[in-house]
From Swiss-Prot, chain A:
Entry superkingdom: Bacteria
Membrane topology, as annotated: Multi-pass membrane protein
Family recorded in the similarity comment: Belongs to the ATPase C chain family.
Keywords per UniProt: ATP synthesis, Cell inner membrane, Cell membrane, CF(0), Hydrogen ion transport, Ion transport, Lipid-binding, Membrane, Transmembrane, Transmembrane helix, Transport
Pfam families, A to Z: ATP-synt_C
Gene3D superfamilies cross-referenced by the UniProt entry: F1F0 ATP synthase subunit C
Marked site positions, Reversibly protonated during proton transport: 61
Disulfide bonds: none
Assembly and interaction partners: F-type ATPases have 2 components, F(1) - the catalytic core - and F(0) - the membrane proton channel. F(1) has five subunits: alpha(3), beta(3), gamma(1), delta(1), epsilon(1). F(0) has four main subunits: a(1), b(1), b'(1) and c(10-14). The alpha and beta chains form an alternating ring which encloses part of the gamma chain. F(1) is attached to F(0) by a central stalk formed by the gamma and epsilon chains, while a peripheral stalk is formed by the delta, b and b' chains.
Transmembrane segments: 11-31, 53-73
Role: F(1)F(0) ATP synthase produces ATP from ADP in the presence of a proton or sodium gradient. F-type ATPases consist of two structural domains, F(1) containing the extramembraneous catalytic core and F(0) containing the membrane proton channel, linked together by a central stalk and a peripheral stalk. During catalysis, ATP synthesis in the catalytic domain of F(1) is coupled via a rotary mechanism of the central stalk subunits to proton translocation.
Name of the featured protein: ATP synthase subunit c
Subcellular location: Cell inner membrane
């Protein structure tokens, strides 16, 4: 159990940054769930909106990816 | 469908039995092999699989060194060429299996470009199709055990994303001139809000290549790292390692899905950016 305070901070920071990935999961679930809710009300319109669904998921995911990037930077680049 | 499956079960019951026995033996051999090497806990580091190595000789790695990344990128290019050249060799009215695969991929991406970016984006379809097939095959080849996943490296995906970003930006200015800047001037918003929105739009525009590249690399890399973490569990648990092996099988199925979806998402975002370049007005 050796190591210095800076390394400890690095690991704690990386773990905290990983919380952002969970937040992105909430966002992605929101997009997909709302798509499903809308699709079940009007199934005939659903097929044309799958591209929009994936774009929405990608945008929601992008911010989670920034959190992941911060975690990676803290682990390997600092 | 139901009668079909019962029929095949009746016919090939013995063959199915043999398959189950083989799978069981394979799993036991897999766990036994791990027992020897990885008895000391997580001896394999999950990130080791992304290490770039020289293929020939020793020494430092430069720009023109042939590495495992180069090899697997070349292999995915070869696969794309093989699919398209082999698939379109006959060009028959009733397509063969390879031809229908090639037609399926072509039609899928063409439809996507037309739906998302509009008809006038079709001249840029070859570029988008190339991107899609390269990423798809790089992802799928990375799922072959002991292979190397090129798209898990940000260096690879960043080049792809920067190419898209530069293409789209230059195209926007060539097609619209200074009118391309109206992309950042949201004319549907109240006048007082527009300068603030312009700053936000500008930031989000320049963040595009970052999120575009890291989304692909991050998804692929995280999935492969999870597989290796579970492999480490299987080695550490001994005979109970059968549970992580089942988990690996399930996650592998998920990774096949992710490989296809991430190629799709990369392509469809390229189409969205292209649409912004061709029609910047809000």
């Amino acid at each position: 159990m050796e190591g210095d305070i800076a390394q400890m901070g690095q690991f704690i920071g990386a773990g905290l940054a990983a919380i952002g990935s969970g937040a992105a999961a909430i966002g992605v679930g929101h997009v997909a769930g709302n798509f499903l809710a809308g699709a079940l009300r009007n199934p005939s319109a659903a097929a044309g909106q799958t591209a929009t669904l994936f774009i929405g998921i990608a945008f929601a995911e992008a911010l989670g990816i920034f959190a992941f990037l911060v975690a990676l930077l803290l682990m390997f680049a600092v | 469908m139901a009668t079909d499956s019962t029929n095949t079960a009746g016919k090939s019951g013995a063959g199915r039995m043999v398959a189950y026995v083989l799978i069981g033996l394979g799993l036991i051999a897999f766990v036994a092999a791990f027992l020897d090497d990885y008895a000391g806990g997580l001896a394999i580091h999950p990130m080791d699989q992304f290490e770039i190595k020289r293929l020939f000789g020793e020494g430092p790695i430069g720009i023109f060194t042939i590495t495992n990344a180069t090899l697997w990128m070349a292999l995915s290019v070869l696969c794309v060429i093989a699919l398209m050249v082999w698939g379109t060799r006959g060009r028959s009215v009733i397509p063969s299996r390879s031809q229908s695969m090639a037609e399926l991929a072509y039609g899928f991406v063409r439809q996507m470009v037309e739906d998302v970016a509009g008809r006038d984006a079709l001249p840029y379809f070859p570029y988008i199709f190339t991107l899609f097939l390269f990423i798809l095959f790089a992802n799928f080849l990375g799922l072959v055990p002991t292979s190397f996943t090129t798209t898990s490296h940000i260096a690879v995906t960043a080049i792809l994303a920067m190419a898209v970003f530069l293409t789209v930006t230059i195209l926007g200015f060539v097609k619209n001139g200074a009118g391309f800047l109206s992309l950042f001037w949201v004319s549907s918003a109240p006048l007082a809000l527009r300068p603030i929105l312009a700053i936000i739009e500008l930031i989000s525009y320049f963040v595009r290549p970052v999120s575009h590249s890291i989304r692909l690399a991050g998804n692929v890399m995280a999935g492969h790292a999870v597989l290796k973490v579970f492999a480490g569990f299987a080695g550490a648990l001994g005979l109970a390692g059968i549970a992580p092996v089942i988990g690996i099988v399930a996650i592998y199925g998920l990774e096949v899905l992710v490989a296809a979806i991430q190629a799709y998402v990369f392509t469809i975002l390229t189409c969205v950016y292209l649409k912004d370049a061709l029609h910047p007005h809000h």
